[in-house]
């Protein structure tokens, strides 16, 4: 049976050809290798029709132009040569579109990313809608790749090399107004007139490329170029710590094209694409992409979710304010905040105002849209307006009796169907539900701070939580823009449980004499966004260490923190950045102030600050304990799969994405090698490094957690 075409051609009476992109049976348009023959057949028809005045590419999908190339194509390549051939095929197709003798215009609405933007760049002009869904970018670097269908060559020539490098090196996505300002698109119009605006542009001569700003012209010259690439190279190396080979290759390929011409540039692009596709970093990053896509499709349980029309929040603090923001402004649901103190309500409302006003200032949002979203949030000091809320999120202090009281009050003041979701980070959900009249409607919903930035939530059913409660809570988390993983109701859940030994070990090394900045730098070099000591300061030392006694009581000595160190720090009124002093000292500008290590920290904890360990030795000690605990979590079914474990670690604590998560990292080293390292560390530093039974068994059998492909579990 012949495959339905993703590209269809219709010629209007005014002799403008409309090519409609609509990949059959898919929500998103993605480019596949087999579409090349369809596009070539259309190009042949266009060339044969001498009456044509212009061509418009437009999508039939409601909210995307082309979201990128189908990543499975890369996974199917077995060698760098095969991946290189894939890139050359894409380059050739784009060249054929660009070589058409009549104006070719891309009419863009929704996501125009990766190969989609490369197709738009191959057109002679671009018009996009002013809709918030419309974004343009080249995110390939986030998969350990570079744009392989001409993007590294066309974009710098269109918008200037420094602006193009920023887009390609970061995967940054532009909104319509930004794209227009930079010259990436020629016009921005309402969605209702997109096609007509593109047709009008197609009837004119090919749009002439607008002159680049003087700065960009200087940077494109030999002297400016040398300086630019040196500066950007240094900045990129500092940011990536050499862990992401794609960034280095992007710089090399863009510079080749500018210095030696487009022919050499395209050649370098295809070659680099092929080589990068085979790197372990790209394979790991693609595995994270597939796993997160998979998690987002997972309903959490087999039961259908209940309707979600409105949400209540108990507590207007930092977490409550953040949860209110994502519920109203991302999920679009009415939110009612209850706080015993009117100040708490004001704080929560101001939090959302600040977030939205920032978007208005950056021109990402209209003032009218800001007001519309803010109108979804209201507050009260009692339970007025809570009677018909479908789900209540509790974000009060970490106190069991208080949370049990909240359950009782919600059951008394809300509807019989109302779900109670606790944002606890350490208390067992079963204990919170112990006196509930409807325990099947009690669940944990653990957000991470700052709520609006952290993509992960843990959803924690206790033994009596119903399947529908799980499904409804998962549905809410997805509407809030979060990636949810369902975890078992055991102390620390998953993320905090694997994080605690990692932080404990960092503190232990401090007491042994390692310096704060050396420990943090070692873990940043390993690939974490910040080091463990800085992380503790950012979270708040009081908040971050509260869970350690809970974990020690549940799991024993391996979770014990170095004696008296935490209490010494807290007794000295050191809470971290929030009060200006922790392991680091902070200036007066709050979150934006620069930090420096406080030398007084060493005598306070009885340490010398004269360490002897190398950076890899420091990282090894912290990371091995995290890996061991992650394997225990699989063994005890705290997480449902290693997929969830990898996603939880990468999205919840910033485990290096280029390693693919704890389980993929164990596979890359080999379970046997991890066991050998841990046994050596156990001999040197104590029994907390003893590898767990599951890891030892897997090492002995030569087993791995994942199959060899990026998408399949063992």
Swiss-Prot record:
Ranges for the region named 3-hydroxyacyl-CoA dehydrogenase are 306-714
Q: What is its main location?
A: cytoplasm
Q: Does the keyword Chloroplast apply?
A: no
Q: Give the UniProt subcellular location, in the record's own words.
A: Cytoplasm
Look up the record and report any one GO term of the cellular component aspect. cytoplasm
GO molecular function, one example?
Answer: NAD+ binding
Keyword Cytoplasm in record: yes
Alphabetized, the UniProt keywords read: Cytoplasm, Fatty acid metabolism, Isomerase, Lipid degradation, Lipid metabolism, Lyase, Multifunctional enzyme, NAD, Oxidoreductase
- The ranges of region (Enoyl-CoA hydratase) come to 1-190
Q: Record's SUPFAM superfamilies?
A: 6-phosphogluconate dehydrogenase C-terminal domain-like, ClpP/crotonase, NAD(P)-binding Rossmann-fold domains
Q: Which domain of life is it from?
A: Bacteria
Q: In which pathway does it act?
A: Lipid metabolism; fatty acid beta-oxidation
InterPro entries registered for this protein in UniProt: 3-OHacyl-CoA_DH_CS (IPR006180), 3-OHacyl-CoA_DH_NAD-bd (IPR006176), 3HC_DH_C (IPR006108), 6-PGluconate_DH-like_C_sf (IPR008927), ClpP/crotonase-like_dom_sf (IPR029045), Enoyl-CoA_hydra/iso (IPR001753), FA_oxidation_alpha_subunit (IPR050136), FadJ (IPR012802)
Name of one Pfam family that matches:
ECH_1
Q: What is its EC number?
A: 4.2.1.17, 5.1.2.3, 1.1.1.35
The positions annotated as site (Important for catalytic activity) read: 118, 140
Q: Which reactions appear under catalytic activity for this entry?
A: a (3S)-3-hydroxyacyl-CoA = a (2E)-enoyl-CoA + H2O; a 4-saturated-(3S)-3-hydroxyacyl-CoA = a (3E)-enoyl-CoA + H2O; a (3S)-3-hydroxyacyl-CoA + NAD(+) = a 3-oxoacyl-CoA + NADH + H(+); (3S)-3-hydroxybutanoyl-CoA = (3R)-3-hydroxybutanoyl-CoA
* Family of the protein in this entry: In the N-terminal section; belongs to the enoyl-CoA hydratase/isomerase family.
**Role summary:** Catalyzes the formation of a hydroxyacyl-CoA by addition of water on enoyl-CoA. Also exhibits 3-hydroxyacyl-CoA epimerase and 3-hydroxyacyl-CoA dehydrogenase activities.
Assembly: Heterotetramer of two alpha chains (FadJ) and two beta chains (FadI).
Q: What is this protein called?
A: Fatty acid oxidation complex subunit alpha
């Amino acid at each position: 049976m012949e495959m339905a075409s993703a590209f269809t051609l219709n010629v209007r009476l005014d002799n403008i050809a409309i090519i409609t992109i609509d990949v059959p049976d898919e929500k998103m348009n993605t480019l596949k290798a087999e579409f090349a023959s369809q596009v070539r057949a259309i190009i042949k028809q266009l060339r044969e029709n001498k009456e044509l005045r212009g061509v418009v590419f437009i999508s039939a999908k409601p909210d995307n132009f082309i979201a990128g190339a189908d990543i499975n194509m890369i996974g199917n390549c077995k060698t760098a040569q095969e991946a290189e051939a894939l890139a050359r095929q894409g380059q050739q197709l784009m060249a054929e579109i660009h070589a058409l003798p009549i104006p070719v215009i891309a009419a863009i609405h929704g996501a125009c990313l990766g190969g989609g933007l490369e197709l738009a760049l191959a057109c002679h002009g671009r018009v996009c809608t002013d809709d918030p869904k419309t974004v343009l970018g080249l995110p390939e670097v986030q998969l350990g790749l570079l744009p392989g269908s001409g993007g590294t060559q066309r974009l710098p020539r269109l918008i200037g090399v420094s602006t193009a490098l920023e887009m390609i090196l970061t995967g940054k996505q532009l909104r319509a107004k930004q794209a227009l300002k930079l010259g990436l698109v020629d016009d921005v119009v309402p969605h209702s007139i997109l096609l007509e605006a593109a047709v009008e542009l197609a009837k004119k001569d090919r749009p002439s490329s607008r002159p680049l700003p003087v700065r960009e012209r200087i940077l494109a010259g030999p002297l400016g170029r040398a300086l630019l690439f040196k500066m950007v190279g240094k900045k990129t190396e500092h940011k990536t710590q050499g862990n992401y080979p794609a960034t280095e290759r992007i710089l090399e390929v863009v510079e080749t094209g500018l210095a030696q011409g487009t022919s050499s540039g395209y050649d370098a692009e295809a070659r680099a694409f092929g080589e990068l596709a085979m790197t372990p970093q790209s394979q790991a990053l693609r595995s994270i992409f597939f796993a997160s896509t998979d998690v987002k499709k997972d309903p959490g349980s087999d039961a259908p979710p209940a309707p979600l029309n409105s949400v209540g929040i108990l507590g207007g603090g930092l977490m409550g304010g953040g949860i209110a923001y994502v519920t109203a402004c991302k999920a679009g649901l009415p939110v009612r905040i209850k706080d015993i103190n009117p100040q708490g309500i004001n704080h929560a409302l101001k939090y959302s105002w600040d977030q939205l006003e920032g978007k208005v200032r950056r021109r990402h949002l209209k003032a009218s849209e800001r007001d519309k979203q803010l109108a979804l949030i209201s507050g009260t000091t009692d339970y007025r307006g809570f009677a018909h809320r479908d789900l209540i999120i509790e974000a009060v202090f970490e106190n069991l009796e208080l949370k049990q009281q909240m359950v009782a009050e919600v059951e008394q003041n809300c509807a019989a169907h109302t779900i109670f979701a606790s944002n606890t980070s350490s208390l067992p959900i079963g204990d919170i539900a112990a006196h509930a009249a409807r325990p099947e409607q009690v669940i944990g919903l653990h957000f991470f701070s700052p709520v609006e930035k952290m993509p992960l939530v843990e959803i924690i059913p206790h033994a009596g939580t119903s399947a529908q409660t799980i499904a409804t809570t998962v549905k809410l988390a997805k509407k809030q823009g979060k990636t949810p993983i369902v975890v078992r109701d055991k102390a620390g859940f998953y993320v905090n449980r694997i994080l605690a030994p990692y932080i404990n070990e960092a503190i232990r090394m401090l007491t042994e004499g390692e310096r704060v900045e050396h420990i943090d730098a070692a873990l940043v070099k390993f690939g974490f966004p910040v080091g463990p000591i800085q992380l503790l300061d950012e979270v708040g030392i009081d908040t971050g260490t509260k869970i350690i006694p809970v974990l020690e009581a549940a799991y024993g000595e391996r979770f014990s923190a170095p004696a008296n160190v935490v209490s010494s720090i807290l007794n000295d009124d050191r809470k971290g950045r929030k009060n200006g002093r922790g392991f680091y000292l902070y200036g007066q500008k709050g979150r934006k102030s620069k930090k420096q290590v406080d030398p007084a920290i060493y005598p306070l904890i009885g340490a010398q600050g004269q360490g002897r360990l190398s950076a890899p030795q420091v990282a090894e000690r912290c990371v091995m304990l995290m890996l061991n605990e992650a394997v225990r979590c699989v063994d005890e079914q705290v997480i449902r799969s290693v997929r969830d474990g990898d996603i939880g670690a990468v999205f919840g604590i910033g485990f290096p994405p280029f390693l693919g998560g704890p389980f993929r990292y164990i596979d890359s080293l080999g379970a046997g090698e991890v066991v050998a390292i841990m046994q050596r560390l156990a001999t040197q530093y104590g029994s907390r490094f003893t590898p767990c039974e599951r890891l030892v068994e897997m090492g002995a059998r030569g087993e791995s957690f994942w199959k060899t492909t990026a998408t399949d579990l063992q």
